């Protein structure tokens, strides 16, 4: 399902410099290719992609970094060993345009979030 051109994802990406926007857009595109019936909303003040009405992830630009929020601390813990050298906290993965999150890790995050949402 295409996202709204004036929705929260497009609005956020429009204000991001081109280099960073390309990295964030790649994450959004991966979700759109993988997740059926993707939606969008604002959750915790972040533009958020949804699955079955629940937050699957947010990928945003901050002042000094890019960040991925999988809206689940257990997901970050599950992929932490594969993200050595990235700045991690309970619910956040910080990265940059120079060092994006590898696509296979994005795929794992998506799969883990979908599983958690499906299991309710």
Residue spans for each PLM region:
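Charge-dense, helix-prone N-terminal extensions
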Residues: 1-120
């Amino acid at each position: 399902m295409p996202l709204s051109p004036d929705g929260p994802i497009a609005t956020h990406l429009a204000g991001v410099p081109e280099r960073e926007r390309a990295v964030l857009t790649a994450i959004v595109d991966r979700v759109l290719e993988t997740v059926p019936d993707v939606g969008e909303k604002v959750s915790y003040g972040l533009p958020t992609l949804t699955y079955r009405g629940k937050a699957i992830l947010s990928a945003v630009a901050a002042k000094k970094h890019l960040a991925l929020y999988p809206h689940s601390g257990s997901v970050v813990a599950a992929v932490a060993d594969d993200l050595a050298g990235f700045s991690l906290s309970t619910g956040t993965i910080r990265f940059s345009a120079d060092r994006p999150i590898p696509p296979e890790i994005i795929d794992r995050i998506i799969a883990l979030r979908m599983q958690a949402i499906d299991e309710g």
